[in-house]
Amino acid sequence: MKKGIHPNYDEITATCSCGNVMKIRSTVGHDLNLDVCGKCHPFFTGKQRDVATGGRVDRFNKRFSIPGSK
């Protein structure tokens, strides 16, 4: 491999919004702030988050729903 053309591969700290702190290696060069991680992601925890599904989709479904279905 050529010398001097590859980025530095350093240890950084990745901090999740749930408070989980991980030491990882990356070429980013600075610490990361994550929204979700393996300890708080709904897929891994089995818990479902409440997500507001309002707005345009609900308005569309209400407008074009067939009476008597569901």
Swiss-Prot record:
Relay the cofactor remark from the entry.
Binds 1 zinc ion per subunit.
Cellular component GO terms, alphabetical: ribonucleoprotein complex; ribosome
Q: Which SUPFAM superfamilies match?
A: L28p-like (SSF143800)
Q: Which family does it belong to?
A: Belongs to the bacterial ribosomal protein bL31 family. Type A subfamily.
Keywords of this entry: Metal-binding, Ribonucleoprotein, Ribosomal protein, RNA-binding, rRNA-binding, Zinc
Instruction: Summarize subunit and interaction data from the UniProt record for this chain.
Output: Part of the 50S ribosomal subunit.
Q: Pfam families recorded for this chain?
A: Ribosomal_L31
Ligand binding (Zn(2+)): C16, C18, C37, C40
Q: Which GO terms describe its biological process?
A: translation
What is this protein's function? Binds the 23S rRNA.
**What is the name of the protein in this document?**
Large ribosomal subunit protein bL31
Q: Which cofactor does it need?
A: Zn(2+)
Molecular function as annotated in GO: metal ion binding; rRNA binding; structural constituent of ribosome
Its signal peptide is none
